Structure formats: structure tokens, C-alpha cells
Amino acid sequence: MVDIYLCDDVPELRHLLRIILEEDPGLRVVGETGDAQIGIEEIAELQPNVVLLDLSMPGMDGLEALPLIRRAAPDTSVIVFSGFTEAKMAALVLERGADRYIEKGESLERVRETVRELTISR
């Protein structure tokens, strides 16, 4: 079973992601939040296999949260799932420790495929 944590400030998107991810019987969403600070605390406790992280959130953004998530859960894969489409942003988040960068324009099925790819390769 692959445990996934969702960190995005849009509740409707988190709901859709949960539905798409849990269509795969090997994937399970173990937690979610719209607040990066709460996310870091819960990720440290839950130690999920994968975190889906948005960059643009109120308070602490995903770019600030990324290294803190890495410290709190070093064995967790982080997929940044963001509306920023600039190549520079993708390069920056990968440089800061994300395992993958997916634009929100991609299909939600692509997110599920990426989760699977990451967890198979580990």
C-alpha cells in the first residue's frame, strides 16, 4: 500500500485527487490539508510514501515547505503539483528537493501514474 498526503489549499482539488488516486487499490490518501505548516507536522507524524504539494498556498508556500518536508520525512517522495508553468519554477523545485514537478494543466490520471512510477522505482 502506498500512503499519500495531499497539501493544497483548494479543497475541491484535494477531493478530486483523493478520488482519482484511490481508484487504484494500491494507493491510499492518509491525510490532507490546505495549510503547509499543518502539513509539515502531519507528514512528520505519518511518514507517507508520497506528498503531493502545491506551491501557491496562503501563509507558508510550497517552496518554503519543501525543505522542511524533506527534513521531517527524508524517505518520502515529493511531487510538486502546481499551476506555475514556467520552466524555471520546475527547475527550482527539483533543485530544492522535489522528486517530480507536474503542472496542474496535466490530467489527474497523470498524477496517479507519477505516484506509481515514483513508488515502483524506490
Where are these regions (language model features)?
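Active-site beta3 strand of CheY-like receiver
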Residues: 46-52
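Alpha4 helix (beta4-alpha4-beta5 surface) of REC/receiver domains from two-component response regulators
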Residues: 64, 85-102, 106, 112-113
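Acidic catalytic/metal-coordinating carboxylates
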Residues: 35-38, 61-64
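Conserved acidic segment of CheY-like receiver
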Residues: 1-12, 17-21
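Short hydrophobic/Thr-rich beta-strand motif most characteristic of the beta2 strand and flanking loop
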Residues: 26-34, 42
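Conserved sequence signature across two-component system core domains
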Residues: 7-8, 33, 51
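Receiver (REC) domain active-site loop signature in two-component systems and cognate sites
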Residues: 57
